Amino acid sequence: MQKYISEARLLLALAIPVILAQIAQTAMGFVDTVMAGGYSATDMAAVAIGTSIWLPAILFGHGLLLALTPVIAQLNGSGRRERIAHQVRQGFWLAGFVSVLIMLVLWNAGYIIRSMENIDPALADKAVGYLRALLWGAPGYLFFQVARNQCEGLAKTKPGMVMGFIGLLVNIPVNYIFIYGHFGMPELGGVGCGVATAAVYWVMFLAMVSYIKRARSMRDIRNEKGTAKPDPAVMKRLIQLGLPIALALFFEVTLFAVVALLVSPLGIVDVAGHQIALNFSSLMFVLPMSLAAAVTIRVGYRLGQGSTLDAQTAARTGLMVGVCMATLTAIFTVSLREQIALLYNDNPEVVTLAAHLMLLAAVYQISDSIQVIGSGILRGYKDTRSIFYITFTAYWVLGLPSGYILALTDLVVEPMGPAGFWIGFIIGLTSAAIMMMLRMRFLQRLPSAIILQRASR
């Protein structure tokens, strides 16, 4: 029992800074929305539309680079720290290549925006302008993620938290300058949010690099002799590990976007109630997601040390802590669902629907916690391909179709509206949790030599 308590302390010490970093990131988006809304409703809508296109694109690159964390953790655990610098340099090359592709996609996203049904031309122009300003921050964001993954792979999660809050503090005044045109800068409105956010990502990257150069604990790995050229073998391996994670993230983000589109014709009350419940659920999701990042680090480190039993302990402890957290957040959601809904909107119909949907959200929080921590465990074992297959099957083969049938058709019951989609979420997330656990159990039953061989690739 003592080993699980000790492991839980280590996991929480890693996870809490990740939680705070994620809160800072979420707050940046909130600040952009509020400050753009203070300028005009059109500018706020433009930022919302631009963000809905930016997120799937940049999260794809983010997911690709998540492969670095277990690779570095495993090298650190095995005492092969001299190889970490080369992996990081190749991560920067990969981030550079991917950022160019993302920038090209975002530059041409105007075709998507202007093809939206009944969109106001002025709104479309502002959304395109916002994206074309923001896309210059894509390299800065991805380079920052490489540096952050280096730190987190070495079990140092506090730097990412500090840089997140530095970014938030810089974002507010820079937003103000570019939205309203102060200190000789042009008055850009919502487009100014894109300029500010792009600048902030570069500030965060440069601040993180400055920290790494000065950190004594990383002095032995930050210098590499000669100029590091692209290494096709290393980059191929990073892509093999990262692409399934990137696709899984992409499928998850697009799932919720598709559901939002399917709910939109049902009316203002249904859309508002759905959005409130989804927004609150996303806030609660930060807890297991951050714990999953910590579990990836611990499992990778233990496998690097050659101890499959300690890796199992880290995995099981992560799941137990995650289930406890989810139980508490579910109780909190059920107990205060109406008060929470009132924080967003005071329309009685909207509050009633949102409170009802939050009951369903409380049901799936435990499944959601298990599936996301399970994904973190599999990343630690470098078994990322199975994450893609499980995510795609659970969300797009089981969850979305069942939600659509329940919400919009009478094949099973009378059309349930948004609640049908939320039952679909429960089906999808529970299926993902079951499949993640089965895969984890399969991996942990393999002979230790095979597990360690797979982890060292």
Swiss-Prot record:
Main subcellular location of this protein, as a coarse class: membrane
Looking at the keywords, is Cell membrane present?
A: yes
Print the keywords alphabetically.
Antibiotic resistance, Antiport, Cell inner membrane, Cell membrane, Ion transport, Membrane, Peptide transport, Protein transport, Sodium, Sodium transport, Transmembrane, Transmembrane helix, Transport
Q: Does the keyword Ion transport apply?
A: yes
Q: Which GO terms describe its molecular function?
A: antiporter activity; dipeptide transmembrane transporter activity; xenobiotic transmembrane transporter activity
Membrane-spanning regions, if any?
11-31, 53-73, 93-113, 127-147, 160-180, 189-209, 243-263, 276-296, 314-334, 350-370, 387-407, 418-438
* Membrane-related topology note: Multi-pass membrane protein
Question: Which Gene Ontology terms of cellular component type are present?
Answer: membrane; plasma membrane
In this entry, the parts of the chain located on the Periplasmic side of the membrane are 32-52, 114-126, 181-188, 264-275, 335-349, 408-417
Q: Where in the cell is the protein located?
A: Cell inner membrane
Which residues lie toward the Cytoplasmic compartment?
1-10, 74-92, 148-159, 210-242, 297-313, 371-386, 439-457
Gene Ontology biological-process entries: cellular response to reactive oxygen species; dipeptide transmembrane transport; protein transport; response to antibiotic; sodium ion transport; xenobiotic detoxification by transmembrane export across the plasma membrane; xenobiotic transmembrane transport
What's this chain's function? Multidrug efflux pump that probably functions as a Na(+)/drug antiporter. Confers resistance to many drugs such as fluoroquinolones (norfloxacin, ciprofloxacin, enoxacin) and tetraphenylphosphonium ion (TPP). Also to deoxycholate, doxorubicin, trimethoprim, chloramphenicol, fosfomycin, ethidium bromide and benzalkonium. Also able to export peptides; when overexpressed, allows cells deleted for multiple peptidases (pepA, pepB, pepD and pepN) to grow in the presence of dipeptides Ala-Gln or Gly-Tyr which otherwise inhibit growth.
Q: Which family does it belong to?
A: Belongs to the multi antimicrobial extrusion (MATE) (TC 2.A.66.1) family. MdtK subfamily.
Q: Can you say what this protein is called?
A: Multidrug resistance protein MdtK
The species this protein was found in: Escherichia coli (strain K12)
